[in-house]
Swiss-Prot record:
Residues 102-170 bind DNA. Residues 1-10, 55-65 have a biased composition (Polar residues). This is High mobility group protein 20A. It comes from Mus musculus. Residues 1-112, 178-210 are annotated as: Disordered. One of its GO terms (cellular component) is nucleus.
Length: 346
């Protein structure tokens, strides 16, 4: 009797599947048969059609469970394939840059930043670089449209200049050489993709193992406490290093500002000295011309040399030597020299 009841309750387990509706109907008809509440249940269990429906229901249920497991497994595989990144220890190669290409145009915002950054740093040297960038961004957003348009117009003109120069450059031989280099590099890159994929896959496995080893530590254990202490000590050391680097950076920034001020002062001194040298050079040329014209009628005793603008310096040296060597023999000549010098003083 209990086996008949058990066999009559099996079909409803597969009522959700399409292939089990017939078996459910068979069980229901067995329960409502006029011979008794369990009269046809035994018959349905021995019926081959019922057994076939039952096996079909089990097969459909197993296929549905496999499909659900496959759907759950697929996002994990996709997520695992998307995970990754650049392998540790590898450096991204910089893209090829054509040194012969025309200079890229600057936007209006970049032009404004370049113009105002140095002015703001000169006024407020203690402000860090990120704060200066933020302040300039706010200043740009509040800039009147007519002032902002000036930078945008300059950017448009620079863009037109770049397009013209680029069009001319693309017709040169240097551009063709750079294009061939780029194509050769792309071919080499395609050969390295397989090795890069393998390295990425190995890195993913290594990362998973590390994550699993860290997250598998049970909490509230001695191992977990030691791990937490090690992490806290590492964080303290990093904070300490960060503070030291910030202090060094601030000291270097002050040193740079002081050096910049000293350089500016030296540049001002150099300009002043150059102007002073120019004035002295002009005065020296004027004095040479005056001496040449004054002593043009006074040849040196013994040699008879007459001064010119080019030889006035050597003439004056020899004149001085003659006066000191024989002052008694050249008294008349010395008196004439005194008269000429007195006229120069006037």
């Amino acid at each position: 009797m209990e086996s008949l009841m058990a066999s009559s309750t099996l079909p409803p387990l597969f009522a959700d599947e399409d292939g089990s509706k017939e078996s459910n109907d068979l069980a229901t008809s067995g329960l409502t048969h006029p011979e008794g509440p369990y009269g046809s249940a035994a018959t349905s269990t021995t019926n081959p059609e019922f057994v076939e429906d039952l096996s079909q229901g089990q097969l459909l249920q197993s296929e549905a469970s496999n499909a659900v497991e496959g759907n759950e497994q697929r996002p994990e595989d996709e997520q695992r394939s998307k995970r990754g990144g650049w392998s540790k220890g590898r450096k991204r190669k910089k893209p090829l840059r054509d040194s012969n290409a025309p200079k890229s145009p600057l936007t209006g915002y970049v032009r404004f930043m370049n113009e105002r950054r140095e002015q703001l740093r000169a006024k407020r040297p203690e402000v860090p670089f990120p704060e200066i960038t933020r302040m300039l961004g706010n200043e740009w957003s509040k800039l009147p449209p007519e002032e902002k348009q000036r930078y945008l117009d300059e950017a448009d003109r620079d863009k037109e200049r770049y397009m013209k120069e680029l069009e001319q450059y693309q017709k040169t031989e240097a551009y063709k050489v750079f294009s061939r280099k780029t194509q050769d590099r792309q071919k080499g890159k395609s050969h390295r993709q397989d090795a890069a994929r393998q390295a990425t896959h190995d890195h993913e496995k290594e990362t998973e193992v590390k994550e699993r080893s860290v997250f598998d530590i049970p909490i509230f254990t001695e191992e977990f406490l030691n791990h937490s202490k090690a992490r806290e000590a590492e964080l303290r050391q990093l904070r300490k290093s960060n503070m030291e680097f910030e202090e060094r950076n601030a000291a270097l920034q002050k040193h740079v500002e002081s050096m910049r001020t000293a350089v500016e002062k030296l540049e001002v001194d150099v300009i002043q000295e150059r102007s002073r040298n120019t004035v002295l050079q002009q005065h020296l040329e004027t004095l040479r011309q005056m001496l040449t014209s004054s002593f043009a009628s006074m040849p040196l005793p013994g040699s008879g040399e007459i001064p010119t603008v080019d030889t006035i310096d050597s003439y004056m040296n020899r004149l001085h030597s003659i006066i000191l060597a024989n002052p008694q023999d050249n008294e008349n000549f010395i008196a004439t020299v005194r008269e000429v010098v007195n006229r120069l003083d006037r």
